[in-house]
Amino acid sequence: MEIDYYDYEKLLEKAYEELPENVKHHKSRFEVPGALVTIEGNKTIIENFKDIAEALNRDPQHLLKFLLREIATAGTLEGKRVVLQGRFTPYLIANKIKKYIKEYVICPVCGSPDTKIIKRDRFYFLKCEACGAETPIQHL
């Protein structure tokens, strides 16, 4: 009697059992709320900024620092919203948030949004909680 050591179904089941719990039951798509942008005079306000940062599982200050550098302006975090000096279109704000997600949230190895930023010595890494990959990222 021959034993098939490479039975596909058994190997697939074994691989599935070794996945972390947060990956096994992850059935929903990664969704980030759209930025609610209003312009008042010479100021641009992102009303749901803290909600966006929470959806990305990131510190709001980190996301704010990225946005301020990208659009070259000053701004402050006031409760759940951000006030930026200058007039910026919702399209520009949305594109900058997408760029942040690509660089600082999505794992470049497996594409999972389940990541965190870790610091080792003087370097920062994007650590994926799904596949375990650590990718160096630029410090803000």
Swiss-Prot record:
SUPFAM superfamilies: Translation initiation factor 2 beta, aIF2beta, N-terminal domain, Zinc-binding domain of translation initiation factor 2 beta. InterPro entries: IF2/IF5, TIF2_bsu_arc, Transl_init_fac_IF2/IF5_dom, Transl_init_fac_IF2/IF5_N, Transl_init_fac_IF2/IF5_Zn-bd. Keywords: Initiation factor, Protein biosynthesis. It holds the Pfam family eIF-5_eIF-2B. Gene3D superfamilies: 3.30.30.170. SMART domains: eIF2B_5 (SM00653). One of its GO terms (molecular function) is translation initiation factor activity. Heterotrimer composed of an alpha, a beta and a gamma chain. eIF-2 functions in the early steps of protein synthesis by forming a ternary complex with GTP and initiator tRNA. Belongs to the eIF-2-beta/eIF-5 family. This is Translation initiation factor 2 subunit beta.
